[in-house]
Each structure stands twice: as structure tokens, then as C-alpha cells.
Amino acid sequence: MRANVLKRKLSLRIKRKKRIRAKISGTQALPRISVFKSNRTLYIQAIDDVKAVTLAAVDGRKIGVKANKEGAKKIAAEFAKALKAKNIEEAVFDRNGYLYHGVIAVLAEALRENGIKL
């Protein structure tokens, strides 16, 4: 892809991210689940925006999974265990400007299947 196309895609994602973040916020009881997707792996974390603290986080590199749908299911299962250990059953899903499609959608569905209410 040409550089200007990539810059445009990134700027559109940043715009979506800002629009989403203006509307949602996490607390201790209802944390914000933020997702970051790179070409190689996924990162997911639960954030309390009031105290600006990360409550739980899972790094796909440490689990040894890739940024694909199967990896998203494994990361979601690990993350759900971490949340349940901290007695968190409900959260707000922040897709971080990514389209709710593919890996991001599978990740959200897998969290729901593992008992986290989004």
C-alpha cells in the first residue's frame, strides 16, 4: 500500500477512537476493556479510568498466540480468568477505533462466552 493510504487509514482509526472514548469510561465496578491489535499479536486490558489504573491485562506474546481468530479466543479465555479472579463480571468494551469485525468481534464474543457481560 502507498504511504498516504496507510496514513489515511490510521487517521480514520484515531478519529473513531476519540469518538468512542468521548462516550465511554471505566470504573472499578465497571472497567473499560481496551484492545490493541498489532500485525503479530493482541493485547487486552481492563482499565479503571477514575483512578487511571490497569486492573488486569493479557499479552498475546506471553501466551504464545497470534493476532487471528483462534488467538483471540485463547486470549479472551485467559483474560476472563484474570477478571474473575478480581471479581469482575461486567465491563465496557472499548474496541479502540478498530472496526467491530473479524478478530475484534471474535474477541468480544469469546469474552461473553466466558461469562463476562459486555
Swiss-Prot record:
Signal peptide: none annotated. InterPro entries: Ribosomal_uL18_bac-type, Ribosomal_uL18_bac/euk. Gene3D superfamilies: 3.30.420.100. Pfam families: Ribosomal_L18p (PF00861). It comes from the Bacteria. Keywords: Ribonucleoprotein, Ribosomal protein, RNA-binding, rRNA-binding. GO terms for molecular function: 5S rRNA binding; structural constituent of ribosome. GO terms for cellular component: cytosolic large ribosomal subunit. Disulfide bonds: none annotated. GO terms for biological process: translation. Part of the 50S ribosomal subunit; part of the 5S rRNA/L5/L18/L25 subcomplex. Contacts the 5S and 23S rRNAs. Belongs to the universal ribosomal protein uL18 family. NCBIfam families: L18_bact (TIGR00060). This is one of the proteins that bind and probably mediate the attachment of the 5S RNA into the large ribosomal subunit, where it forms part of the central protuberance. This is Large ribosomal subunit protein uL18.
